[in-house]
């Protein structure tokens, strides 16, 4: 058995296959909190960055000094990466599919005793074994200009054109419409959903202003009400007013007024039978995941299936 540092993984979590033993001199097993993290990718770096972020948030107090190396596809580019790693040794995460390119990086790290981890190997090996198909090993393949790419662009253009109540008379052309009071994360949530391929519109609820009839009559889109804890919403609005050098005690930010506004919004959602998502303690990604699930059920009732693009 390779000399794994069990303190790194625990008895129930052996290191991934192919992961080199961590040298005890690297300091990771001695409570090290700050370290150099090199992220190496043969494409845009989104995958390796997302996986690294998802892992790092599980460790409190860890502050990596991140070095990004994108579009690494040739020997010369790998040599520059290796030089950078030599200058700031630490931990290396990579997503490289070309065997020759990754071989250079792995050999250099092995020679210098630097831990070097391929994040996609377990997934690719599992898929290959299950499907009985060899991996094609084409870098950046997920970024080809295919139908998914153009669908994403189309969704982004639609969403930008239908932000904050614009062109709400065309709401029935949307996949998803978000409705909520001011500062309830409608626009950023719509943009995230658009990046997943959904045509989105959003409409702000303003006290004393009735809903447009086109929105109430819309049958095709999933209409979702967004709500937020009044205290949190009041604080956010006050911060917004401070940023704009405006009076913080305006009705817009007063707690009692905000509370009444939120209650009125909930009554509207209930009357129209719209599902409600409370975004108080949810990130944009978490709220969007809930909305996507609602949309999938919305389509199932019509005998359809949602096609969700990867993030």
Swiss-Prot record:
Transmembrane segments: none annotated. Its EC number is 2.7.11.32, 2.7.4.27. InterPro entries: Kinase-pyrophosphorylase, PPDK_reg. ADP binds at residues 180-187. Bifunctional serine/threonine kinase and phosphorylase involved in the regulation of the pyruvate, phosphate dikinase (PPDK) by catalyzing its phosphorylation/dephosphorylation. NCBIfam families: PRK05339.1. This is Putative pyruvate, phosphate dikinase regulatory protein. It comes from Paramagnetospirillum magneticum (strain ATCC 700264 / AMB-1).
């Amino acid at each position: 058995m390779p000399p794994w540092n069990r303190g790194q993984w625990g008895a129930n979590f052996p290191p991934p296959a192919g992961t080199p033993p961590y040298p005890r001199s690297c300091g990771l097993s001695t409570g090290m909190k700050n370290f150099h993290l090199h992220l190496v990718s043969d494409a845009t770096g989104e995958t390796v960055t997302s996986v690294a972020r998802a892992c790092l948030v599980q460790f409190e107090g860890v502050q990596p000094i991140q070095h990004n190396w994108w579009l690494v596809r040739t020997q010369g580019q790998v040599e520059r990466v290796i030089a950078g790693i030599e200058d700031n040794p630490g931990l290396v995460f990579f997503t490289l599919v070309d065997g020759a390119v990754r071989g250079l990086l792995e050999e250099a790290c092995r020679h210098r005793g630097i831990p070097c981890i391929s994040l996609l190997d377990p997934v690719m090996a599992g898929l290959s074994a299950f499907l009985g198909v060899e991996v094609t090993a084409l870098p950046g393949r997920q970024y080809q200009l295919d139908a998914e790419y153009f669908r994403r662009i189309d969704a982004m253009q639609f969403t930008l054109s239908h932000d904050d109540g614009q062109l709400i008379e065309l709401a029935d052309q949307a996949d998803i419409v978000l409705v909520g009071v001011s500062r309830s994360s409608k626009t950023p949530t719509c943009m995230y959903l658009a990046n997943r391929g959904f045509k989105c519109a959003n409409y702000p609820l303003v006290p004393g202003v009735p809903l447009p009839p086109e929105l109430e009559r819309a049958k095709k889109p999933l209409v979702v009400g967004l709500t937020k804890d009044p205290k949190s919403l009041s604080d956010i609005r006050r911060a917004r007013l401070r940023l704009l050098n405006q009076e913080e005690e305006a009705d817009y930010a007063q707690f009692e007024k905000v509370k009444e506004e939120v209650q009125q919004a909930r009554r509207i959602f209930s009357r129209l039978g719209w599902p409600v998502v409370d975004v108080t303690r949810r990130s944009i990604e978490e709220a969007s995941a809930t909305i996507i699930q609602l949309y999938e059920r919305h389509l199932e009732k019509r005998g359809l299936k949602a096609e969700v693009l990867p993030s």
